[in-house]
């Protein structure tokens, strides 16, 4: 079987805030898929970066009395520590504020400009006369021009749902300074998205997107595509538009290009051919994992920019839903706006990896982290079922049989059943239906435990003439545990390493499962995973308020 060449990305976390459990849903989803691809023998690179530009970064740095460069460096360090703690294994983690990103962004812009895809026109915007800066919609608040509700942002009303321009807002105030904005004209640069309507319609209907996303895009096509404002006025933290004074690339122009920039850095470091992955006629695979809220940028602007600058388009975009906790939006007052670091202070990161896997499918439905179900699921599935197989069997092998598995198994058909399930589990992983993969695995874990219950080695060991059967039963149980942990390795990489040490093997490999471990010496079993206690959940909630 020919090895596939795959490049995978996750959306870039913004560099003005810390990672929380909502962010982690996507990175865990992506990491599981990448680890699975590598287990299948595919060449798979996983790149990401901090999204480090924009007005919010500039203002946050100003508030902290540091430079934007210091802010984004500090935040990048925090992000990477959190990701490493959750076993998110990037091939490269970079920043959009990099030379690679500046070079590629400039190159793409110049290609689009020469081809006639960049237009200019004068627009009217809200302007803060005190801070001497134009105001993005989220930096203006006032009364909704439709229903009159106060404290609404400059683009839409959260009360009546109306959309409008910021200059229509009544009694508007600058969120930054508190003064009343004035209206001021400025020349802006636009990417002429409507020119790509035909290519985009073809691309969005060619199997690159989930059906729900493709249907949503059809609605947007009916409404008509609009030119996209890709410029922002100084002061702004970002890359200056070539040969244009006081104008910068909008953060959403260089953010997706950050995927390419991060990969370019990896290519330079590891002697990988960048063009093999991004040339227009590339035979490699490119996948973007994103949240459903940024589909417009990734499924319209991004492929259009790539087409216009003569690069390849993504093989597919995989969107997921939002995270809710206990059925509601994450909330600081309820203690459910949980930072990654807060979680790590109290719980094993692999609990969350498993629970997300148990919930995630290829659909864009929202995922609920119900903390009661979370505790019960981990205690039942991982501790009570999977780990229990090894903990019930290893003691017999170690104490009674010199740590050595038996020379043959009396239930070879049973082992074959576990092995044969590998194909369907692999299909579920490939299709990102992790929830289905987990259900197959736990069903097998139940069967393994039932097998041990049926033979009762703790009773057989008391009978001198049943020692061989005890040896065979517990040896088979250990082999079944090995199969299950191989299937779970993309989800539980830390525990998989501990199991490799316990089993005294180099690595758990999918292709090695055809044959059980025979006459093989294992090591003493050590507890692999502890139960979640109620007070651990309670302390996380308290610490998050």
Curated annotation (Swiss-Prot):
Residues annotated for Zn(2+) binding in this entry: 144, 147, 157, 160
One GO cellular component term: cytosol
Subunit record text: Monomer.
Cofactors required: Zn(2+)
Leader sequence residues: none
Keyword annotations from UniProtKB, A to Z: Aminoacyl-tRNA synthetase, ATP-binding, Cytoplasm, Ligase, Metal-binding, Nucleotide-binding, Protein biosynthesis, Zinc
Protein name stated in the entry: Methionine--tRNA ligase
Function per UniProt: Is required not only for elongation of protein synthesis but also for the initiation of all mRNA translation through initiator tRNA(fMet) aminoacylation.
Organism: Vesicomyosocius okutanii subsp. Calyptogena okutanii (strain HA)
Principal subcellular localization: cytoplasm
Binding residues annotated for ATP, in chain numbering: 332
Keyword rRNA-binding appears in the UniProt entry: no
Cofactor annotation comment: Binds 1 zinc ion per subunit.
A Pfam family assignment: tRNA-synt_1g
